[in-house]
Regions:
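Generic structural signal for helix capping and beta-alpha/helix-loop junctions
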Residues: 10, 42, 67, 95, ...
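Active-site mouth loops of central-metabolism enzymes
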Residues: 4-16, 60-67, 97-100
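Active-site acidic/histidine proton-transfer and metal-coordination neighborhood
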Residues: 23, 39, 56, 64-157, ...
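Histidine-acidic metal/acid-base catalytic patches
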Residues: 1-28, 79-82, 140-159, 163-257
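A short acidic, amphipathic alpha-helical/loop segment
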Residues: 45-49, 73-74, 170-177
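Active-site-proximal beta-strand/loop segments in catalytic clefts of secreted hydrolases
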Residues: 6, 36, 62, 89-91, ...
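Glycine-rich, proline-tolerant flexible connector loops at the mouths of alpha/beta enzymes
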Residues: 34-50
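Short, well-ordered alpha-helical microsegments
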Residues: 42-44, 68-71, 210-211
Length: 257
């Protein structure tokens, strides 16, 4: 289990902040992170700070542009930080919404996945809720098209259980359909406020059956569970959100929930 650093993105923009943030997480008991939203810190310096704090990187989120146009440098950076799994955090708007756009998304990510695999790396895609919405021109969804048309050898998933749930699907069922294609799962929770608006909350305080998701992740032998909390932190403090959620994750792991 670990923390998706996008949760703490405002606290990893400089090398000193990255160091201080990792030290704080290590003190909590965190030994693994996902890197996302980090500032312009050279990979060598990132690695030194990671090693200093005894923390490993299980996966990253990087841009589609770098995957397509700067791949060699991107892979070199990942070699330096000791990570061979790279995620795309979201499909651009022009690559979703209808079958033609999704087809182009699949074509481009297939090429990326093949290029990465040829060099010993793996491509993964992180979902939101729009992948579970009906397309404009077909009685299907983007996620169904991905399931039907992507090649498991070159296209993996980073399933986000809150976004799956908010999109109207059962996270456990989706995890089972992704079997063998997941290395990292995102644990996230949310509520609907009095106006019906989505608001993220610390783990265990919302609508997602995280115990069922945890049991499914164990059954499917998914190696990593990362806590992610995009916005809406308690007291506007992402560290407080991490502390509350980390305690929940440890209780899950220890069978106390």
């Amino acid at each position: 289990m670990g923390i998706q650093l996008y949760t703490l993105r405002d606290h990893i923009k400089t090398a000193p902040d990255f160091d201080a943030t990792l030290a704080r997480l290590k003190k909590m008991g965190v030994g693994t992170v996902q890197i996302s939203g980090i500032g312009d810190i050279p990979a060598e310096e990132q690695r030194a700070i990671l090693d200093k704090n005894g923390i490993d990187v299980c996966i990253t989120h990087k841009s589609l542009d770098r995957m397509e146009n700067d791949l060699d440098a991107l892979l070199k950076e990942h070699e330096i930080i000791g990570c061979r799994d790279i995620g795309l955090g979201c499909a651009p708007k022009e690559l979703r919404g209808n079958t033609a756009n999704v087809g182009e998304f699949l074509r481009r990510t297939d090429a990326i996945g093949r290029n990465m695999k040829a060099k010993g790396f793996s491509f993964y895609y992180h979902n939101h809720s729009f992948e579970f919405e009906k397309l404009e021109d077909a009685d299907t969804t983007m996620m169904e098209m991905i399931f039907e048309k992507s090649d498991p050898e070159f296209f993996g998933f980073i399933p986000d259980v809150a976004w799956i749930h908010f999109g109207g699907s059962d996270p456990v069922e989706i995890l089972e359909r992704m079997k063998g294609r997941v290395k990292v799962i995102h644990f996230k929770d949310y509520i609907l406020d009095e106006n019906g608006e989505r608001r993220f909350v610390p783990l265990g305080q919302g609508r997602v059956d995280l115990k069922a998701c945890y049991e499914a992740a164990c059954k499917l032998e998914i190696p990593y569970i990362m806590y992610e909390h995009d916005i809406d932190w308690p007291d506007n403090d992402p560290f407080k959100a991490c502390e509350i959620s980390w305690d929940y994750m440890m209780k899950l792991q220890n069978g106390e929930i």
